[in-house]
Amino acid sequence: MPHISASEALSHITVLDLTRVRSGPTAVRQLADWGANVIKIEPPESIEPDGSLGASRDTADFQNLHRNKRSLTLNLKDKKAIEIFYKLVQKSDVVVENFRPDVKDRLGINYSKLEKINPKIILASISGFGQDGPYGKRPGFDQIAQGMGGLMSITGAPGEGPMRVGVPIADLTAGLFCAMGIQTALIEREKSGKGQWVTTSLLQAQIFMLDYQAARWLCEKTVPKQAGNNHPTSVPTGVFKTSNGAINLGVAGETIWKRFAEAVNKKEWLEMPEFSSAKARLENRDSLNGLIEEVTLKKTSEEWVDELEKVGCPCGPIYSIDEVFNDPQVKHLNMAKEINTDPFGKTCLVNQPFNLNRTPNDFKQKPPIKGEHTKEILNELGIKDDELSSLEQNNTN
């Protein structure tokens, strides 16, 4: 079927998607879900079997990453296929790739080449460590970036050694930052009339996500340590056991500290010197946390959330993934959005985390079968049906 825009927001933009695994597809998903005409370009099955790089098509992971796209198979190592790719570049706005940096040069699809074909083209590249430099040629993996980006040194309980986070955060954030870079370049192009090369890496994204923890080192020369579920500087903030589980508390600042102490019927804490200021509470974190947990163990998580919310004290339950999607607010936000897919039939995938009131997004196209739209897309380029069979015989597509 022809491209059906998932939103009017980016329906005027055509994107050539050369990405694989996670960081690149995450970037392209942001464009596809907001209406861009995304053409996912993949090697033919004979060249690269399904699942060789990343999740196979029948997994929830693949389905969640690749909705709202069409699929074209092209063997970019073939001369005729590269000619077809160049024709696509002439008619497109954005090319996104996350190959190792030198692959673009070998294939003849680096920015200097694409810019000559279409001066308005935006090439977006995600790498492990940057396009050049001492580590420029290294392949990038999320867990490696989590370690080299410092995140694992501040994740987990004190003394237990480095710990990765439960999602591929470097991949995901590199993809999101890449999408932001693309959108910035598209806006700038309206002024200059020119494209440009957008680059980011897993390492850059991970370091940026350190945020205030990185700033503590850069400005104060403080090396943050593992703090488990405790906040590094705000006390009491963390996880506290209840009679049927645990809750998160975020008691930051003197006003909320006072509300909290009164709500749990412990006004005497307000008079104790060891808890009289934020600095004092930080220095006496362990003793204060112990006293708080003696109190929170006396009621259920639901009771504490209800009572503390009434007095404006930040708190919340700690959900498993199934509980997340059963929460009434999550349902209200429509974070699980319906779609029909080939492997799962009618199911739900994770929706976008922001809304546009005039140009909302939707799931208009199920994740494609490899090469599902090859004939259609090549016909749009002016390649006739009688040429397609010879292209297939030559492993061009």
Where are these regions (language model features)?
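Glycine-rich beta-alpha junction loops
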Residues: E45, F129-G130, L202-I207, N244-A246, ...
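Flexible, small-/acidic-enriched active-site or ligand-binding loops
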Residues: P2-A6, S276, N340-S390
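Oxidoreductase and adenylate-handling cofactor-binding alpha/beta cores
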Residues: G175-G195, F208-C219, A261-E268
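Aromatic-enriched alpha-helical interface/lid elements that frame and gate functional surfaces
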Residues: N230, V235-V311, C315
